[in-house]
Design a protein with these regions (language model features):
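Adenosine-phosphate binding glycine-rich loop
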Residues: 3-112, 116-118, 122-123
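C-terminal non-catalytic interaction/assembly regions of soluble proteins
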Residues: 56, 112, 116, 152, ...
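Long, charged amphipathic helices and adjacent flexible linkers at domain junctions
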Residues: 128-163
Length: 169
């Protein structure tokens, strides 16, 4: 069974209570001290970022579905070490990890592009994003201070295109 006990601060049933009855139960709550915290911080900021970046006329169902699918895709992928360190445990998709954690740095550069694409595909965008790769890179840069330095180095390397010739012998 799948149980979403969303009452806060005390869920209708705790994961311990549910697992005492059914050890295979998948339980999600709104609390950060239990696995599978369902919290609007996982969706709203990134949904809005994608919508704002395309100057969307409205947030339509397709954009919300794109947000949900991006979250589901992230949950199935390997969890970065930095997230595991923040939670003090190795996380992988399964009963106790069905949704990414709020501290997953991938959220900022995976959800807004999905939302923006859906908005552009459905005509909600007033200002479509032309360079999606550049957009994703700009989102990554916001979370990683070294990304802007590396981006500059890569840009210089691409522009100079120097050749290196190695002599034999």
């Amino acid at each position: 069974p799948v149980i979403f006990a969303m009452a806060n601060p005390d869920p209708e049933i705790t994961p311990e209570e549910a697992h005492a009855v059914r050890s295979d139960a998948i339980v999600a709550t709104g609390r950060s001290d239990y696995p599978n915290q369902v919290n609007n911080v996982l969706g709203f900021p990134y949904l809005f970022r994608g919508a704002l970046d395309i100057h969307a006329r409205a947030i339509n169902d397709e954009m919300k579905i794109a947000c949900a699918r991006a979250l589901a895709d992230l949950a199935r992928e390997e969890v970065p070490d930095e997230v595991a360190l923040a939670y003090g445990t190795k996380l992988s998709f399964g009963r106790d990890y069905i949704i990414p954690t709020p501290f997953d740095p991938r959220l900022i550069y995976r959800i807004p592009p999905a939302v923006a694409r859906a908005g552009m595909d459905t005509g909600a965008a007033r200002r479509p994003i032309v360079d999606m790769d550049g957009y994703e890179l700009s989102l990554k840069t916001r979370m990683d201070p070294t990304a802007s330095i590396l981006r500059g180095i890569n840009a210089r390397a691409r522009s100079s295109q120097a050749r290196i010739i190695f002599a034999e012998g």
